Amino acid sequence: MMLGAELVTETVQNIIDGKVTPIPQEQMHTDEPLRPAPKIFRETCEIKWSEHTVDTAHNFVRGLSPYPGAWTTLLSPDGKETVMKIYRTTKEACTKTAQDCPTLLPSANSDKTLRIALPGGILHIHELQLAGKKRMNASDFLRGTSLEGWKVNCD
């Protein structure tokens, strides 16, 4: 965010000083015509864990947050599925992580995040929303929920 703030300040100053010449989009010289971005559907926002490393999963969440929001399904020990939207994550590089299906790690970590082991590291979930509930911090979620026996749906 700091880089963006510096860039905005620098750009505004260059405009004030007359160092920037604006070019209308219609006059830009490109080899390809401009294309609109593809429409995002609910299915597009599902995190398909088997297709992601820790880096791509983190970037997927960032790209869809805050709206429409990336989501996944958690499986309870009795087989019940729960939809969870994920809004904010960080990543931790780690050599010993999941190779095939991602693993939901126990919540006994100091920063109180929901952790998922993926190829290339651990994804720390900081903000989430369960179906029918309000958006919450992972620490609040973990205080009221025992995740023993829960799994991430990796189908």
Q: Where is each model-derived feature located?
A:
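Active-site-proximal loop/hinge segments within enzyme catalytic domains
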Residues: 1-92
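C-terminal active-site/capping subdomain that shapes the small-molecule cofactor and substrate pocket
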Residues: 58-155
